[in-house]
Amino acid sequence: MVQPSLRKDKTPFSNPSTDEIWLPERCLFADAANFYATGLHELVHWSGAKSRLNREMKGKFGSEDYAFEELIAELGSAFLMADLGIVGEVQHESYIASWLKALRNDKRLIFKAASAASKAHRYLMDKI
């Protein structure tokens, strides 16, 4: 089974070129729920690699392509949190403006994102 390589950093992110997830240490989060929510969000990104679910992940912060992948990760992490019984608030205010712009430009985007998030959810739950 392929497993993500976890690295400690102050900023969480998934690095497709090295197939690694960088996640701050637990002590840097307000509570365990936010730590797990962030880790699950990054795992959803990780699941989109060509060798896994092969999602097209492109675009820079603020672009519609980037917003789409972030929406997938946010929905996927919410699905995973629900299945795993993790209750908490996930706050990604920095993405909301780009989500709204992308959603206004494509009325079906939420359904496309939910479908991709559901696939990521199933993929990751099958690995547990």
Could you say what each language-model-derived stretch is?
Residues 59-74:
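Active-site metal-coordination segments of metallo-dependent hydrolases
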Residues 6-9, 58-63, 83-86, 105:
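Active-site-adjacent structural elements in folded domains
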Residues 50-56:
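Alpha-helical transmembrane segments and their helix-helix packing motifs
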Residues 1-20:
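Catalytic zinc-binding patch centered on the HExxH motif and its immediate surroundings
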Residues 37-50, 73:
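Active-site recognition of the HExxH zinc-binding catalytic motif
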Residues 66, 78-128:
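Long, well-structured alpha-helical subdomains associated
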Residues 21-38, 63:
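Short pre-active-site segment immediately N-terminal to the catalytic Zn-binding motif
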Residues 32, 36, 69-72, 113:
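Hydrophobic (often cysteine-bearing) scaffold residues that line and stabilize catalytic clefts
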